Amino acid sequence: MRVALLLLLVAALLTQYPATAAPQAQGPGALAASALDFEYFRTRVQPIFLAKREGHTRCVSCHSKGTPMRLQALSPGAATWNEEQSRLNFRVVQARAVPNSLTSSKLLVHPLLAEGGGDFYHSGGKHWNSFLDPEWQTLANWVCGRKGNEKLVELTGACGAAD
């Protein structure tokens, strides 16, 4: 009897939400859609994913294949992404960025050396030894909602003062 009542209750609750409803974003990056700037992402953040670094492959080499942060593959012969691909990349990357939170943003801590403030995880290696690296600073400025090239003077949890 209790099982039947429980099933009836669950069925009643499920009918309140149509199957065609769009899922709501959840998790730390859920507010990122409104807080992060697409144009800054397109012109300053995306080029970092294409940059060649000594001792490493380009981010796009791995992140356009079987990784959770999957970027769009470049079109044949293209040197960068088109508008539609950039918007898809933006959606993927913003889920790894927590606006105004440097140490909660996987985008910032995964590829940063642990001794420099990063975490242990990033199977693609550590691309930056310090949060003072110019590329890392560009990513941090995006997460902090800054439009310029302000330099962070210290690595804290929240976006703080700049030079």
Task: Tell me the role of every PLM-derived stretch.
Residues A4-T15:
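Bacterial N-terminal signal peptides
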Residues Y17-D163:
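Aromatic- and Gly/Pro-enriched helix-to-coil junctions and flexible linker segments
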